[in-house]
Every structure is written in C-alpha cells, then in structure tokens.
From Swiss-Prot:
GO terms of biological process kind: cAMP-mediated signaling; G protein-coupled dopamine receptor signaling pathway; gene expression; memory; neurogenesis; NMDA selective glutamate receptor signaling pathway
Description of the deletion phenotype: Conditional knockout in dopamine D1 receptor (D1R)-positive neurons improves working memory, long-term memory, adult neurogenesis in the dentate gyrus (DR) and increases dopamine D1 receptor expression on the plasma membrane. The synaptic plasticity of glutamate neurons in the DG is increased.
Subunit composition and interactions: Interacts with DRD1, the dopamine D1 receptor.
PANTHER family: HYPOTHETICAL LOC314168 (PTHR35350:SF1)
InterPro entries recorded: C14orf28-like
Purpose of the protein: Could be a regulator of the dopamine receptor signaling pathway.
The name this protein goes by in its record: Dopamine receptor-interacting-protein 1
Length: 310
C-alpha cells in the first residue's frame, strides 16, 4: 500500500490537464472519531461514544504542510524529533501515511495544544471539540522552542537604566515597514528583525545609541520556519521571495497558509517536485494542482524550509 505522500507524488506525475485534482479527500474539515468501548464504558461519567471536531481549518493547513516538510528531507524527521519527541513524529507520519485524518488531528490537539486553547463540551453522546480561532494560536505557538530566537543589545550611554537587554521570541512575526520603500518588502522586514543595527535608545531620557547584535536561533537553525504575515496588506505582497537568509542560513519557500475573510476559513498552498498544490479541507475536492495563486485570499503565513548544505 502506497503512503499518502507517494500517492500525491504519483498523481502529480500522471496528471493530465483534464483532471488536476487528487483522487480522494485529504484531511477533510472537521472529523468524527468513534470510541470503541467495552461494557465498562457504560459506567463512565460523562458518557460519550464519539468525538466530533469542528472548525479544524486552524490546524489542517499546517498539518498538511508539516507532513510535506517531513517527507522532503530524510534528516528532518530526526531533527524535529528533538523538539516534538520521537514518538510524536513517528505517530504523526504513520497516521498521515495511512489516511487516519481525524486521529492525526486529535494527536495534535492532545499532544501539543493547551486545554484553554480550544472549547469542548459534551452534547448528547458526543464530545465536541471546537478549534475556531486563529491558526497561529492553535499551531505556530505550539511548536515548542523550534523557532526561538534571541537578540542582544547594549546602549552607548553608561547611565542608561537598562543598558544591556535581550529580546527572545518563540515565533517569527514579520511586520510591514512603516515607510514603504522600494524593493523586496518581505526581505527588508526579515532583515529588520534579524540583522545587526544601531538605533537611538528608546529608554526615557537616555539619548544614547543602542547597538543590536544579529538575531540568532536559540537551538540552531530549524528545519523550517513559519513567518506570521497576518498584519500585511495584499498590496504590500506583490512579490514573495523564493529564498531568505536567516541567521547565516538559507531558507527556500515551501508553502503558505491563506485566509478567506468572508468565510473566516484557512487553507494552504505548498509545492512538491516543483508543482504547486492548493489544499482546502472544506471543499469536496480539496487538493488540486495550481495554474495560478488562489484568488480573493489573504496571506496568513509563509513557510520556508532550510536549504540542504552542499
């Protein structure tokens, strides 16, 4: 039996223009998990015999991207095991390979999310878990310390009340430049966050110059990074760079997550073997080859994978 990833690659290779869609639904929105309980389950309180998932698009697109990333490089599963745990990575890949889509969502919810990040209630004989919200809250912030970065700075004024500072961040949120210059805006914004620089110290009454060191990853360059782009306007995103330099490492564009404002719904785009695909778990035909970028969708995040060192 072929794995899901092998099936997707085969469908790309054997694709004809008449049919650009994958032959079966992948990670469909929501999900129902039936509990195979014995007789003793009757005495449980509260009693429910199935788990129903709602509004799972806040994790679906990233789960699809994570699956593709883990299959892109043979060293990535081992590296990510250091952050997520070997058991989680092995179980995640097995469940995706075998089309166990509801179970893989439950794996993420119970292993990586905090209880306060989602709503749950017992309705009749079902436990209903609702993931309505923001995908960066439900996924990106739960990536352990994978993308943690740190940047130090010191002020030239010896009397500065906080002369030496350290700024540590667990996620990478890229803000658009306040003044829109010419050139690659995303790369400029990334450089603003990561590169060394000298600025006027913002401490009240200081007046000194603050020198910032290069921002570096706390645990080495991760296999992939997620750039939070939800504060950007479409007109600022005319060009998306296919590679970025982050802390002396080159990263290549692998995919993106997209937001439909009217439906308050997330989807994802990613590439396999140079072909771009669009995944939308809410549609009946939810995995298709792209001729052009999806229209009327806002960019929520960009996902880059670390380039292989030659």
């Amino acid at each position: 039996m072929k794995t899901l990833f092998e099936e997707i690659k085969a469908s790309i290779k054997n694709n004809y223009n008449q049919d650009r869609s994958f032959w079966r639904p992948v990670l469909p929105w929501g999900g129902v998990f039936t509990i195979k309980a014995g007789r003793k389950a009757v005495s449980c309180t509260p009693l429910y015999v199935e788990i129903r998932l709602k509004n799972t698009c806040t994790i679906d697109g990233f789960l699809m991207l994570l699956y593709v990333i883990l299959n892109e490089n043979e060293s990535f599963p081992r590296e990510l095991s250091l952050h997520f745990g070997r058991e989680f990575v092995d179980c995640f890949l097995y469940l995706m390979d075998t089309y166990s889509f509801t179970t893989v969502k439950l794996l993420w919810i119970w292993d990586k999310m905090e209880k306060q990040q989602y709503k749950s209630e017992v309705h009749k004989a079902s436990l209903v878990i609702d993931l309505f919200g923001n995908e960066h809250d439900n996924f990106t912030k739960n990536l352990e310390n994978l993308m943690s970065t740190i940047q130090g700075s010191y002020c030239s004024n010896w009397h500065c009340p906080t002369r030496v500072q350290e700024d540590q961040q667990r996620t990478i949120s890229i803000n658009p430049p306040q003044e829109i210059p010419h050139g690659n805006l995303i790369r400029l914004a990334v450089d603003e966050l990561f590169c060394s620089k000298i600025e006027l110290c913002e401490e009240r009454g200081c007046g000194g110059l603050r020198e910032f060191s290069q921002r570096v990853f706390c645990h080495g360059a991760p296999p992939f990074v997620v750039l939070n782009m939800q504060h950007w306007k479409p007109e600022d995103l005319a060009y998306v760079p296919y590679y970025l330099d982050l802390s002396d490492h080159k990263y290549l564009l692998e995919g993106a997550t997209l937001f439909n404002k009217e439906e308050h719904h997330y989807s994802a785009a990613f590439q396999i073997d140079g072909h771009w695909m669009h995944y939308d778990g809410l549609r009946n035909v939810n995995l298709i080859l792209l001729n052009k970028p999806p229209e009327f969708l806002l960019l929520s995040s960009l996902v880059y994978i670390r380039a292989t060192e030659k």
